[in-house]
């Protein structure tokens, strides 16, 4: 046994663990996966939908407050009107925008949700590469109601900055991606409730970071019936802003999958030859089209590429208008819908908060976060699924094993991870975990598997410095340690149905408590938590997993572990 433990401390097993060598990031070139059947895809889509909502801090949805819409400052022009808008998407928090409506066209109209990317002037940007007012004006003239609204931190929506989400906020799933997605969901509520809108005919379009908002919204909200995301669905770049990169968003996935989630609804993918969508016609579009084929709906997807740098320019807009006309207006000749000249309004005539203040009771940034936490605490019912989502856990892969004497190396099939332990006797039913890994000091008298989890003891390995948005694509070290314990549980369970016990000390007691909570089989838990009480500071100091407090934290884990 001492020799086995010595070997464990000497073998370079960490070099074999893909979690140290295959570290995806926003500029990784991903390979689209193929689902064999529609049923396979629907199962995966349902999980991805929950993953998006979990990463956004929106699982479950916050309680929807009254929108209290303020619509004012109406301007009437040739064929359309423009109004300023403020809506309350959370109590005391307001989203600003402009409402463009057709004039001289009675009845209910289809509507277009129109967020924006990282243009300097946001929803009011006007330049050759993108004219957001021009887009909205032309759509309104063509017969749509258009709601152009802000990113967080832009124009009229500045109660938070655009860039936020410190580690404590991450524990509660509070960040710009989630707030923007919630704003979009509430924007759909607002538009669908307008008396001149046909809520069964809603579309959405935007470019760049706005396109990210579009495909995430469309992925989780089936009320959007037609989507035109521009210059963003890519296998080689996943987004460069915090508002596109919440922790946990892209565990085992990337933006092409989010584009696939629009199927079988009509989708137009507009790409550019001069940005990260340059390969669309040969790589990403065929991948998305394969999903439409599963639905027997390949006629619903179209694609075009514009020879230009990153944009939503005139050529891109003129590709978009006929697509919406075909699917939302049911126009007889959709190809005739093209952009016409337009006049811009002054910024003061467009900004909702020009010479105007937010409604009484509007909150500050710290107050918004405090309210987010309070609301989340009312939704802390123990849920194994919610915890598993923030950890990115896998309990379905087959666990394989190899042995070298008393050394046991576990790996999940297709994952490339390596979890090392020492069996102190035949048929162990006890898993022992210590923060420093398997050592003689923690050996019990009974047959046990002494586990060395990820980046502990001699399994510590040098890795590349984390790239931007590391936790968007990769589990935290603590989450990986919990996965390793679950992998060991699954391994022992496959050997025998006899009961399994977890014995864990010091910080490893926290790992084991969460592993027991999410284990698909009941385990006996011997894991004294000591001074760890599950406060925000405890998680920041000893056990960092973004979203863990939003998913129920320690109280949920304890309730589930003792079920």
At which residue positions do the language-model features occur?
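Hydrophobic h-region of N-terminal signal peptides that target proteins for export
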Residues: 7-15
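Cap/lid segment of the alpha/beta-hydrolase catalytic domain
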Residues: 106-193, 199, 232-243, 427, ...
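Catalytic-domain carbohydrate-binding cleft regions of carbohydrate-active enzymes
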Residues: 205-225, 229-230, 237-244, 248, ...
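Loop/turn elements at helix/coil->beta-strand transitions in domains of secreted/extracellular proteins
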Residues: 108-110, 142-145, 198-201, 222-226, ...
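Primarily recognizes the serine-hydrolase "nucleophile elbow" in alpha/beta-hydrolase
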Residues: 189-251, 488-562
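Alpha/beta-hydrolase-fold serine-hydrolase catalytic core, especially in secreted/extracellular enzymes
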Residues: 16-94, 270-429, 436-447, 454-498, ...
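Generic beta-strand/beta-sheet core signal
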Residues: 100, 149, 205-207, 212, ...
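Sec-dependent signal peptide recognition
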Residues: 1-6
